[in-house]
Amino acid sequence: TPLYSSAASDVYKRQLHGLANQECLKFVLEVRNHFNGTPTQDELKQFCWDRLNSGRVIPGYGHAVLRCPDPRFTAFMGFGKDHIEDDDIFSIVESLFEVVPPVLQEQGKAKNPWPNVDAASGSLLYYYGLTDFNYYTVLFSISRAMGMIAQMVINRAIGIPITRPKSVTTEWIKNNV
């Protein structure tokens, strides 16, 4: 239904989901442009410290739930290592994975210094020719929609009834939330 579709996808329009891989890729491109290519690990470490000391974050690092590298990040990195050769952007992503977690641990503010899926996904899209950032959220949403559709098919196949949450009024929400 339209309501279900909207409820399922509207969460991706905000920056934390909707723009996350774009922001990560913009950061990687900023690094590449700053150093005219791939920096050394020492240069990258200083660049990250300068960014943190100016009050900004390192995009793609930290996850609300995970306390280890995001398994999706690990899968994307494995794919990139197997299929991408001599690419500055992917090399920077690899170097960031080695540099950023220790920097964030030393800084002491991050509960989770590990990369999330967005730290790698944008670099793969960019490498394979999708350079218009406006489509990144579309692909993210489609991947989520495919998962929801698959779950709906499985639910129908095994006879699980349609879920109809109890309806509440706006007044109830105001009083109880």
Feature roles, as predicted:
Residues 1-8, 12:
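Single conserved hydrophobic/aromatic residue that forms the stacking wall/gate
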Residues 5, 21, 139-142:
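Short alpha-helical patches at coil-to-helix transitions and adjacent helical residues
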Residues 10-15, 105:
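Transmembrane alpha-helix interface/packing and boundary motifs in multi-pass membrane proteins
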Residues 13-68:
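Long, well-ordered mid-to-C-terminal structural blocks that present hydrophobic/aromatic surfaces
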Residues 26-29, 74, 78, 98:
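Internal, well-ordered alpha-helical scaffold/interface segments
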Residues 38, 50-56, 73, 82-177:
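Acidic, carboxylate-rich catalytic segments that either coordinate divalent cations
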Residues 63-84:
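C-terminal domain-closing interface element
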